[in-house]
C-alpha cells in the first residue's frame, strides 16, 4: 500500500510523461479488473496503417472479440481482430516506444479508468512524418458475456 501511494505522489511531482506515471496508471487500471469494454481506436500517422481506422473495438474477457469500421469509406461490418489492441496492449505500446528512446512521448490517461487516451510519439526530432498518435476514445464498460 505504501509503495502504491508513493508512486502516485511521485507521478504527480514528475508529470504524466514519465515512465513512473505510466506504471502507476497501469497499476490503477489493473486494480479495476475491467475485462469487458468497448472503445474507439484511431491511429494517426504516415505509416501505411491498414484496416479499419477509426475502429470500434469490443473486448470480452480481456481479449479483442470484434473490430468494426466506423467510417463509411467503403468498409462495413466486422474485421479480423488480430493486431487491434486491448487496453493492456496500449500500455505495451507505451513500453515499446519508451524502449526506443523517442525524441518525444506524450501520454494522456483517462481520469476515471486510467487507460491511455492518447499516445503521441515523435521518434526523431528533426525527421519528417515519423510521428504517430494512438487514440482510445468513447470507452464504455460492457456486461460480462454469458
What are these regions (language model features)?
Residues 1-14:
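Sec-dependent bacterial lipoprotein signal peptides
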Residues 16-20:
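Bacterial signal peptide processing site
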Residues 32-44:
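A short, Trp-centered hydrophobic/proline-enriched beta-strand micro-motif
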Residues 43-62, 66-69:
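Short, surface-exposed binding/anchoring microloops in extracellular/periplasmic proteins
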Residues 49-54, 127-133:
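Short, surface-exposed coil-to-beta transition loops
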Residues 63-103:
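A short-motif feature that recognizes glycine-rich, charge-decorated loops
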Residues 94-127:
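Short, structured surface segments that line ligand/substrate-binding pockets
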Residues 133-146:
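Short, low-complexity, Pro/Ser/Thr/Gly-rich segments in the mature regions of secreted, periplasmic
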Amino acid at each position: 500500500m505504501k509503495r502504491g501511494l508513493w508512486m502516485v505522489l511521485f507521478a504527480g511531482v514528475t508529470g504524466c510523461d514519465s515512465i513512473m506515471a505510466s506504471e502507476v496508471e497501469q497499476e490503477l487500471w489493473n486494480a479495476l479488473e475491467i475485462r469487458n469494454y468497448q472503445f474507439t481506436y484511431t491511429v494517426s500517422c504516415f505509416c501505411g496503417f491498414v484496416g479499419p481506422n477509426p475502429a470500434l473495438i469490443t473486448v470480452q474477457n480481456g481479449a479483442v472479440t470484434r473490430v468494426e469500421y466506423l467510417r463509411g469509406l467503403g468498409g462495413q461490418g466486422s474485421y479480423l481482430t488480430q493486431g487491434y489492441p486491448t487496453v493492456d496492449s496500449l500500455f505495451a505500446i507505451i513500453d515499446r516506444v519508451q524502449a526506443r528512446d523517442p525524441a518525444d512521448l506524450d501520454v494522456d490517461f483517462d481520469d476515471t479508468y486510467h487507460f491511455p487516451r492518447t499516445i503521441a510519439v515523435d521518434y526523431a526530432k528533426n525527421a519528417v512524418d515519423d510521428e504517430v498518435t494512438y487514440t482510445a476514445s468513447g470507452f464504455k464498460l460492457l456486461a460480462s458475456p454469458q
